[in-house]
A protein has these predicted regions:
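RNase H-like, Mg2+-dependent phosphodiesterase core
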Residues: 1-331
């Protein structure tokens, strides 16, 4: 048996809103060497089902979610994530709070709390149909089972501007924060499946090419062995601590950071989950601020439009007593 974990982020570039890390963990009834081939076969089938209208749109979240598409831009993203929830035999969440608990998230306990509060009470689904999600989850089961693949869990972690800025003040940079959150989530998912061969697939973190130090820190590893550090992929083997660290037959864990990592299905599902959570959060954020300042145009939080939004809300933010670091992520 092998555990395969996919990790990706949403919201790394914006100045407003949370940085969200998504993770998906899968069980493969075979050796690690077969994982890439098995998941490639599953990806081909899922893509064919999607194009035929019979399966979820599991893929790169940046392509699945498009504000220019006809109809609701949220629908395919939401359908993909809620189908994944059902595929792991979890009940479908009916509120944002249910979904946050399922993914291991809680709202920030800082001055910005009111901006995000609606997220816990909003009804789900927002844009898709429950029956469609169930039908597509059944399709996923029928595709995974003959390949010896099963979705074990979904999880997210997030960091809001106040905590992000506080981390910068300790000497971390933006890339450090992303890597520590991502690998911290991967380590948590791995701990749920102890004594098991494991593969962790991550999308590359910006232009960063060397990860041995942060991998060693997040996994408390005695030694991290670099296998490759190229322009397209960085790959490592984790050698565990403890008296059995060098014993033969001990489970191995490999970690890879790849350009275009979303092409691997576990990473794609993680990417979509992170993106869905961020979009729900920004929806709650924009509704809060529209109530505070009628006529204010919503924002996705990316730098150019975030500056427009920041200028237009300056007076109201001052009235509410919100300091700049509570809402504006510095990097």
């Amino acid at each position: 048996m092998t555990v395969v974990i996919g990790i990706d982020e949403a919201g790394y570039g914006p100045n407003l809103g949370p940085l969200v890390i998504g993770g998906s963990a899968w069980k493969l009834d075979d050796e690690p060497a077969t994982a890439a081939e098995r998941f490639a076969s599953l990806t081909d089938q899922v893509t064919a089902d999607w194009r035929a209208g019979n399966g979820p749109p599991w893929g790169d979240s940046k392509k699945v979610f498009s504000r220019t598409r006809t109809g609701s831009p949220l629908e395919p993203l939401e359908r993909g994530v809620l189908t994944a929830v059902l595929a792991r035999h979890a009940p479908l969440p009916t509120t944002g709070g249910d979904l946050l608990r399922l993914l291991g998230l809680s709202l920030p306990d800082d001055a910005s709390h009111d901006c995000w509060h609606e997220l816990s009470t909003m009804p789900l689904p927002q844009a898709t149909v429950t029956a469609t999600c169930q039908q597509q989850a059944d399709t996923i089961h029928s595709r995974c089972q003959p390949r010896g693949i099963r979705l074990l869990s979904l999880a997210c972690r997030w960091i809001f501007p106040a905590a992000f800025n506080a981390s910068l003040d300790t000497g971390c940079n933006k890339s450090d924060i992303l890597s520590q959150l991502s690998l911290g989530l991967a380590a948590e998912l791995l701990q749920q499946q102890p004594a098991t061969e494991a593969i962790i697939w991550c999308d590359r973190h910006g232009g960063r090419k060397r990860y041995a130090g942060v991998v060693s820190h997040c996994f408390a590893a005695a030694r991290v062995e670099p296998i490759s550090e190229t322009a397209t992929q960085s790959r490592y083997l984790i050698h565990a601590r403890g008296p059995k660290a060098h014993a033969s037959g001990q489970p191995t864990t490999s970690v890879s950071f790849s350009v275009g990592g979303e092409s691997q299905l576990p990473v794609a599902v993680a990417s979509m989950t992170a993106k869905y959570i961020r979009e729900l959060a920004m929806g709650a954020f924009n509704r809060f601020w529209t109530d505070q300042q009628p006529g204010l145009m919503p924002t996705a939080g990316y730098p150019v439009d975030a500056r427009r939004w920041w200028q237009e809300t300056a007076a109201r933010r001052e009235q509410l007593g919100l300091a700049d670091p509570d809402l504006w992520r510095r990097a």
